[in-house]
């Protein structure tokens, strides 16, 4: 009822939005908690069309507001015909950017152009602002994920220091095992475990059993998981095997400065993500570095969600209650790269009316050996100490471990 009015309907094919709107999960596709479906939402009822053979829990079969209907291939058309006969529909909304050609054919066959109404982000804008219950669930998921990542880094470094042969594939496997041991159902995307020069590849995805961790290698871990509540986690940390070179400390510290500046921003309601993006890039740009990706994306049922964006092109405001990433990086081809990613919650500032700030959900300490403290301003040093104290309380600070 927050999205559509009387005699209106909304056709949805975006699986994460369907899963969020009806608060159901299926884990039907790799690295996702969604279920396969199409959906028509009315003001007080949702009709969910699912492929035959997909199990539906008994408690959902007699739900007062959700009606699950099994359909064969092409069966969506017949369900739309039935919908048209049984309900007075003056307008049916759909997303022009995501509807498939097949689904649009069905819609345009049943509804004329006057009724069929393209409209973007009707669900995404509502889903972006998390409820108090959802925020609690996110905090619970990240508390588990933080421990899994911290344990992985400790395990890998311990094995390396004990002179074990630890490969990129071992690094990958160790990460996924630690998530599973902590109660994760699956990963929220394929784990990125990059060793040495592979850390300079932004979305590295081919861990090798032949790439053995060596002294001086940068190790980049970008990973996430789903727990029972079905919301995604996503965090990146970069650390070092052995002792770092000066160039490694420089790029790590510049990335850290950008993360600290962005994460500690205080900004007016209505501020666009582009303003925060500039804060993250400025420290490295002063020394000639930059990165070819956005600084932040939303997170929800999927690891990437609309409604929250931090990039040079972000032209929408950051809203209270939204959750997303801050993830600056520097990547030097054939040498190595650094990315640091925290997931944050946008909250009203506790002291300043009309202002917002970020609260980190990711609480995993930074690599002390890679920080050049002389490069940090006094303000950034305070920011770092405050963040490490949060991590220390969760047992996830390398500074105090």
Where are these regions (language model features)?
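Active-site neighborhoods and metal-handling regions in enzymes and metal-associated proteins
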Residues: 1-401
């Amino acid at each position: 009822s927050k999205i559509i009015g009387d005699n209106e309907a909304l056709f949805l094919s975006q699986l994460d939005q369907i899963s969020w709107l009806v608060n159901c999960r299926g884990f039907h596709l790799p690295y996702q908690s969604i279920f396969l479906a199409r959906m028509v939402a009315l003001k007080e009822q949702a009709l969910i069309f699912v492929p035959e053979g997909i199990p539906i829990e008994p408690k959902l079969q007699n739900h007062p507001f959700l009606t699950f209907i099994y359909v064969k291939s092409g069966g969506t058309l017949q369900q739309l015909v039935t919908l048209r006969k049984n309900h007075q529909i003056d307008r049916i909304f759909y997303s022009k950017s995501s509807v498939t050609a097949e689904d649009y054919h069905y819609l345009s066959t049943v509804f004329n152009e006057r009724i069929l109404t393209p409209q973007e982000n009707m669900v995404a804008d509502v889903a972006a602002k998390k409820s108090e219950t959802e925020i609690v669930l996110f905090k619970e998921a990240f508390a588990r994920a933080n421990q899994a990542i911290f344990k992985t880094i400790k395990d890998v470094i311990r094995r390396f220091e004990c002179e074990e042969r630890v490969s990129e594939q071992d690094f990958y496997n160790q990460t996924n095992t630690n998530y599973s041991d902590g109660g994760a159902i699956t990963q929220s995307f394929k784990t990125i475990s990059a060793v040495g020069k592979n850390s300079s590849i932004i979305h590295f995805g081919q861990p090798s059993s032949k790439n053995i961790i060596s002294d001086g290698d940068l190790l980049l871990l970008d990973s996430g998981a789903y727990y029972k509540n079905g919301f995604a986690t996503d965090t990146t940390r970069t650390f070092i095997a052995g002792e770092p070179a000066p160039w490694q400390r420089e790029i790590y510290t510049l990335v850290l400065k950008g993360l600290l500046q962005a994460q500690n921003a205080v900004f007016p309601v209505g501020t666009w993500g582009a303003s925060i993006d500039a804060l993250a890039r400025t420290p490295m740009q002063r020394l000639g570095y930059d990165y070819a990706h956005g600084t932040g994306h939303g997170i929800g049922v999927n690891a990437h969600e609309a409604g929250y964006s931090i990039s040079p092109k972000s032209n929408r405001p950051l809203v209270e209650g939204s959750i997303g990433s801050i993830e600056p990086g520097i990547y030097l081809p054939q040498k190595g790269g650094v990315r640091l990613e925290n997931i944050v919650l946008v909250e009203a500032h506790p002291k300043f009316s009309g202002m917002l700030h970020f609260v980190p959900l990711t609480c995993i300490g930074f690599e002390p050996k890679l920080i050049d403290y002389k490069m940090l301003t006094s303000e950034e040093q305070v920011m770092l100490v405050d963040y490490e104290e949060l991590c220390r309380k969760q047992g996830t600070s390398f500074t105090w471990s």
